[in-house]
């Protein structure tokens, strides 16, 4: 059995790490490189960086900090933000990123997933999916351009359909960003995760809602996700990564102890 992964998420805007609640009202957390270094030293298995306004601004992720992160950490990291071409991806990987993640550009042009997977290998192509639960209809819908709330839009895709589509096109991993839970810290949406897990045959990463160590345990034990991504509980030092991993190990979760 592969070890479950703990993945801090760093949302980047204007060269700094920020964090919002339900993708709105972002506050500045701190500088990118020191935070990345801290999480690596605490025992994170991987880091994910989202340049949250790159796609909505029509630009690619700012590459200047990518190489600096690569110099100071020795764990894999994934970068996302406005990657719309093979050239964009090649540059970011050449600066030291281990994986690239695409979200809004994949919705605009799904063939991008296949072209990236063919060129760089499925193992480094992650598709991020921003999913919103509509309580009125009881359905999960994929959103686009979520980094800028004034431009966010609901797509025609239902989440479960899009999860299956991106796998057909070559996604090597899926990060499910559950927008209703984002930053609220009241737990992952286990019901949605279980439904997605049934149709997701590549590694699945849960994102949005972690507030306690038990929330991580529930995601691994009840929804069988491969990794759990979180931001505010780590940024605000509510949960220490080393202590979290020790707790999960005592609960029988296969985890890399540092």
Curated annotation (Swiss-Prot):
Changing residue 124 to A: No change in activity. The keyword tRNA-binding does not apply. GO terms for molecular function: imidazoleglycerol-phosphate synthase activity; lyase activity. Pfam families: His_biosynth. The active site is at 11, 130. Keywords: Amino-acid biosynthesis, Cytoplasm, Histidine biosynthesis, Lyase. InterPro entries: Aldolase_TIM, His_biosynth, HisF, IGPS_HisA/HisF, RibuloseP-bd_barrel. Pathway: Amino-acid biosynthesis; L-histidine biosynthesis; L-histidine from 5-phospho-alpha-D-ribose 1-diphosphate: step 5/9. GO terms for biological process: L-histidine biosynthetic process. It is found in: Cytoplasm. Its EC number is 4.3.2.10. Heterodimer of HisH and HisF. Belongs to the HisA/HisF family. IGPS catalyzes the conversion of PRFAR and glutamine to IGP, AICAR and glutamate. The HisF subunit catalyzes the cyclization activity that produces IGP and AICAR from PRFAR using the ammonia provided by the HisH subunit. This is Imidazole glycerol phosphate synthase subunit HisF. The gene is hisF.
């Amino acid at each position: 059995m592969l070890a479950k992964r703990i993945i801090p998420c760093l949302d980047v805007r204007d060269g700094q790490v920020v964090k919002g609640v339900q993708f709105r009202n972002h506050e500045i957390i701190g500088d990118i490189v020191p935070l990345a270094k801290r999480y690596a030293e605490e025992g994170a298995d991987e880091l994910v960086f989202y340049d949250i306004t790159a796609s909505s601004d029509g630009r690619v992720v700012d590459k200047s900090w990518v190489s600096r992160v690569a110099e100071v950490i020795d764990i894999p990291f994934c970068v996302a933000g406005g990657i719309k071409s093979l050239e964009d991806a090649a540059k970011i990987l050449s600066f030291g990123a281990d994986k690239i993640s695409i979200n809004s550009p994949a919705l605009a042009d799904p063939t991008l997933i296949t072209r990236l997977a063919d060129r760089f290998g499925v193992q480094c192509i992650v598709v991020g999916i921003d999913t919103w639960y509509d309580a009125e209809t009881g359905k999960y819908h994929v959103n686009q351009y979520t980094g800028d709330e004034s431009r966010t839009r609901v797509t025609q895709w239902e989440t479960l359909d899009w999860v299956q589509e991106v796998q057909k096109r070559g996604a090597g991993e899926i990060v499910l960003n559950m927008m209703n839970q984002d930053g609220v810290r009241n737990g992952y949406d286990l019901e949605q995760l279980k439904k997605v897990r049934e149709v997701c045959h590549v590694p699945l990463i849960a994102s949005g809602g972690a507030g306690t160590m038990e929330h991580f345990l529930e995601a691994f034990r009840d929804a069988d996700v491969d990794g759990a991504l979180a931001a505010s509980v780590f940024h605000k030092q509510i949960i220490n990564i080393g202590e979290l991993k020790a707790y999960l190990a005592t609960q029988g979760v296969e985890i890399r102890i540092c």
